[in-house]
Amino acid sequence: MLRGAVARRYAQALYEIAQEKNALEAMEQELKGVAEAIEGTRELQKVLYHPQVLPGEKKNLLKALFTDKVSDETLNFLGLVVDKRRENYIAGIAAEFSVLANEARGKVAAEVTTAIEIDEKQKQELVKVASRMAGKEVEPTFGVDPSLIGGVVVRIGSKVIDGSIKTRLATIKSRLMSKTS
């Protein structure tokens, strides 16, 4: 089964629990925090992703780290993920859960990448444009990639709008190369 499909299935299960408990926002933040903690700590990854570390030990570690930081439902969900040996999917599950939560709020996630850091006013303008393009309110994440040279790349779901100078130069190069061949 594809990695995304597994993460989506687990995210859907937790989403349904969150809806029942009326705790969508809280559980989204909890799961995101857990995923960020795992992704940001090499030692934690080594233990959680190691096949010879027993599931009980992994669950005890997660309880020790997150008992005071997440709800019982989120902690139990993490235990289930460990029992099913899907620990390495936690970041993907968190991402898929956010997609479901955004859909419930009538929002869509957008990744906005620019060549240089932009100010708040420019960010707001890009969010307005992206919202019009998506037909929904946009939940943006901003990033910087100097290799773009200039311009902006916006990803909304599977749709990519690439207005970068890097891509324009590559297109011009491709056209020139095809004319000389």
From Swiss-Prot:
Chain's role: F(1)F(0) ATP synthase produces ATP from ADP in the presence of a proton or sodium gradient. F-type ATPases consist of two structural domains, F(1) containing the extramembraneous catalytic core and F(0) containing the membrane proton channel, linked together by a central stalk and a peripheral stalk. During catalysis, ATP synthesis in the catalytic domain of F(1) is coupled via a rotary mechanism of the central stalk subunits to proton translocation. This protein is part of the stalk that links CF(0) to CF(1). It either transmits conformational changes from CF(0) to CF(1) or is implicated in proton conduction.
Family: Belongs to the ATPase delta chain family.
Self-association and partners: F-type ATPases have 2 components, F(1) - the catalytic core - and F(0) - the membrane proton channel. F(1) has five subunits: alpha(3), beta(3), gamma(1), delta(1), epsilon(1). F(0) has three main subunits: a(1), b(2) and c(10-14). The alpha and beta chains form an alternating ring which encloses part of the gamma chain. F(1) is attached to F(0) by a central stalk formed by the gamma and epsilon chains, while a peripheral stalk is formed by the delta and b chains.
Single GO term (MF): proton-transporting ATP synthase activity, rotational mechanism
Topology within the bilayer: Peripheral membrane protein
Protein name: ATP synthase subunit delta
Keyword Ion transport: yes
GO cellular component entries: plasma membrane; proton-transporting ATP synthase complex
Top-level lineage group: Bacteria
Alphabetized UniProt keyword annotations: ATP synthesis, Cell membrane, CF(1), Hydrogen ion transport, Ion transport, Membrane, Transport
Disulfide cross-links: none
Location in the cell: Cell membrane
